[in-house]
Amino acid sequence: NLLAVIEKELALKKSEANAVIPSLISLFEGMGERPRGRFFEGPEGAKAMRDEFLKVKSKMIYGIVDYDKLFQYWPGQQNDYTSVRAQKKIKTRTFYVSKAPVKDANSKEFMREAKFINSKDLDLGASITIYDDKISISTYSANPISVIIESDGITKTVKSIFELLWSK
């Protein structure tokens, strides 16, 4: 009967899968650190991602940001996020891209050190933020896409490049 044939076939497939699973698990575990990625979409996702920054354990955030685009898409950034970050005593060190230097880019009140990059020299389509063992990348648009990558090795590499450039 057809049902018996299907049951026998399924039992065989189950047996084959059970035989392969331990070696797959062993292979996967032997790969070392596996980065974890999280995706965020739309304005709500961008806000959720910024809320993640406020949970930083090291109390230090590094960033590469296009101020002109940031304030175009999130005009309330200073009040909505920066003030809260400063209240939580989270410092930031930022390379900011803009058409001209911004008056209060360096701010003790907002716990921010900043270095200017002229937008003629660098066109950013996304911001990059480095904190703890995470890197976030978020596009500038009315419907932004953001990703957070959690990886100690990747974060150390990007942070080392950031610090090298900062020291120049």
Where are each of the predicted segments found?
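Short, charged amphipathic alpha-helical surface segments
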Residues: 2-36
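Charge-dense, low-complexity intrinsically disordered segments
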Residues: 4, 11, 40, 72, ...
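Short hydrophobic/aromatic-rich motifs at helix boundaries and adjacent loops
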Residues: 20-23, 52-54, 130
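Amphipathic alpha-helical interface segments
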Residues: 115, 120-168
